A protein has these predicted regions:
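Acidic, proline/glycine-rich low-complexity IDRs
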Residues: 1-2, 164-165
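Short Lys/Arg-enriched alpha/beta "domain-start" segment
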Residues: 2-49, 93-147
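Proline-rich intrinsically disordered, low-complexity coils
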Residues: 24, 34, 66, 72, ...
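Amphipathic, interaction-prone secondary-structure segments
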Residues: 36-62, 146-164
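Aromatic- and glycine-enriched beta-alpha-beta binding-site module
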Residues: 55-116
Length: 165
């Protein structure tokens, strides 16, 4: 019997969870026309190359159709969120209201251990940064800063037309 250490066990679970969510995301997209996806999501569809293109976290992301693979190569969960977004976007304009995927009527990404782990990691990452350091990181990701009651409020243009459920 092979003993699996905690890291590899978590990696296997992580990859299995990703794979289990990637399949339905791609399947949903295959039932939609690329022109319709582009219209509802704010992406641009280049028919001659069969590529959808959109801006996410200050980078231009290209998604091949009908394979629905992203380039440049993105972290798996970023790719998954973009694919679900393309399937769910309904053309709703960006607002300043915070909406989570788990809060959406048909959201495929629900509150989970992953959400909790990411929140914990982000909190740990940011706690070691100065306000100027955080501002530089936000700016590198394409954030726009806005006035609020918070010490720092940044708006990230992660997905252009988020579905409002």
């Amino acid at each position: 019997m092979v003993k699996i250490d905690g890291f590899h066990k978590n990696t296997v679970q992580y990859n299995r969870a990703f794979s289990e969510m990637l399949r339905p995301a791609k399947e949903q997209l295959k039932h939609l026309s690329p022109d319709n996806i582009a219209q509802r999501s704010g992406a641009v569809f280049y028919e001659e190359n069969a590529v959808l293109e959109l801006q996410s976290l200050n980078q231009r992301v290209r998604i091949t159709v009908p394979e629905y693979t992203c380039s440049p190569k993105l972290e798996e969960w970023h790719q998954l969120v973009i694919l679900h977004y393309l399937a769910l976007a309904d053309g709703t304009a960006v607002s300043e209201q915070i909406i989570t995927f788990g809060g959406l009527k048909d959201g495929l990404i629900r509150g989970s251990k992953f959400d909790h782990d990411m929140e914990k990691e982000l909190r740990g990452f940011l706690s070691r940064k100065t306000p100027d350091g955080i501002r530089k990181i936000c700016k590198a990701l394409g954030a726009e800063f806005t006035d609020s009651n918070a010490d720092l409020c940044a708006v990230f243009h992660f997905l252009p037309n988020y579905p409002s459920g």
